[in-house]
């Protein structure tokens, strides 16, 4: 057992107690750490593979039950948004698992893209470990509370908010939104971006995220929400 991992602390964050703690240790072991540590023989990659499938099943079931009249294509669009790397990274942040990741010295997370990838893989690996140890029920209990509310899922079914905002402003105002970017730092001290979306010299929405693309999407969605654009499109969903 690796003494660098506080098993009890991680279990408390997951609200799940492992009968096989070694599974959790493996899930928290980045391949780079195994490569640099002769006493470590397993890493998280196989558990990531399993966890990816478990996450897909849980999210699919959740959407299927939440939207009983929704067609398959629209459900697939929402599912893709809820299981992508950015979302999985957010789940890791919400659970506070990142600080427990064992990663090699040569694999330091130096930018947002590397962090997103490592944290997304971490969530999938931990979910795979929970599934192997306790089955689908505890994996579901961990995952579902992390998912957005029904109201927040609805916009995901309509596609990229930047595209929708552009269509709105072109159709109704015959103009295009302008995105202004300034530096931003998260509560964890990670540098990111603050985006303001301007329409006709007026701030319609703002968003902050670790990636510029995600911050722009958040700002665009805030703009759509503020101008009540989504309501007429999602009332019957």
Curated annotation (Swiss-Prot):
Cellular component terms (Gene Ontology): cytoplasm
Reaction(s) catalysed by this chain's protein: Endonucleolytic cleavage to 5'-phosphomonoester
A single BP term in Gene Ontology: rRNA processing
Chain coiled-coil ranges: none
Record domain DRBM: where: 160-229
Cofactor(s) needed: Mg(2+)
Residues annotated for Mg(2+) binding in this entry: 48, 121, 124
Enzyme class: hydrolase
Pfam families: dsrm (PF00035), Ribonucleas_3_3 (PF14622)
GO molecular function: double-stranded RNA binding; metal ion binding; ribonuclease III activity; rRNA binding
Keywords assigned by UniProt, alphabetized: Cytoplasm, Endonuclease, Hydrolase, Magnesium, Metal-binding, mRNA processing, Nuclease, RNA-binding, rRNA processing, rRNA-binding, tRNA processing
All residue ranges annotated as the RNase III domain in the record: 7-135
Gene3D superfamilies assigned: 3.30.160.20, Ribonuclease III domain
Active site (UniProt): 52, 124
This enzyme's EC code(s): 3.1.26.3
Compartments where found: Cytoplasm
NCBIfam families listed in its UniProt record: RNaseIII
Role played: Digests double-stranded RNA. Involved in the processing of primary rRNA transcript to yield the immediate precursors to the large and small rRNAs (23S and 16S). Processes some mRNAs, and tRNAs when they are encoded in the rRNA operon. Processes pre-crRNA and tracrRNA of type II CRISPR loci if present in the organism.
Family (UniProt): Belongs to the ribonuclease III family.
Subunit structure as annotated in this protein's UniProt entry: Homodimer.
Protein name (record): Ribonuclease 3
Organism: Chlamydia caviae (strain ATCC VR-813 / DSM 19441 / 03DC25 / GPIC) (Chlamydophila caviae)
């Amino acid at each position: 057992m690796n003494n660098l991992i506080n098993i009890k602390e991680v279990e408390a964050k997951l609200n799940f107690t492992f009968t096989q703690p070694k599974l959790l240790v493996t899930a928290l072991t980045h391949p780079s750490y195994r490569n640099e540590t002769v006493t470590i023989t397993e890493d998280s990659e196989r558990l990531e593979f399993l966890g990816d499938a478990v996450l897909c099943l849980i999210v699919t079931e959740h959407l299927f039950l939440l939207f009983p009249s929704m067609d398959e294509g629209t459900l697939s669009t929402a599912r893709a948004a809820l299981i992508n790397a950015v979302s999985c990274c957010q789940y890791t942040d919400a659970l506070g698992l990142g600080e427990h990741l064992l990663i090699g010295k040569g694999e330091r997370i130096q930018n947002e893209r590397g962090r997103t990838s490592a944290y997304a893989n971490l969530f999938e690996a931990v979910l795979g470990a929970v599934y192997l140890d306790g089955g689908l029920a505890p994996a579901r209990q961990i995952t579902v509370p992390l998912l957005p509310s029904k109201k927040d899922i609805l916009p995901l079914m309509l596609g990229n908010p930047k595209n929708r905002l552009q269509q709105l402003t072109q159709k109704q105002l015959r103009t295009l939104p302008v995105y202004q970017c300034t530096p931003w730092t998260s509560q964890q001290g990670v540098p990111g971006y603050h985006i303001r979306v301007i329409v006709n010299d007026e701030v319609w929405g703002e968003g902050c995220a670790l990636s510029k693309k995600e911050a722009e999407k958040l700002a665009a969605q805030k703009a759509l929400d503020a101008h009540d654009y989504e309501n007429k499109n999602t009332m019957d969903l």
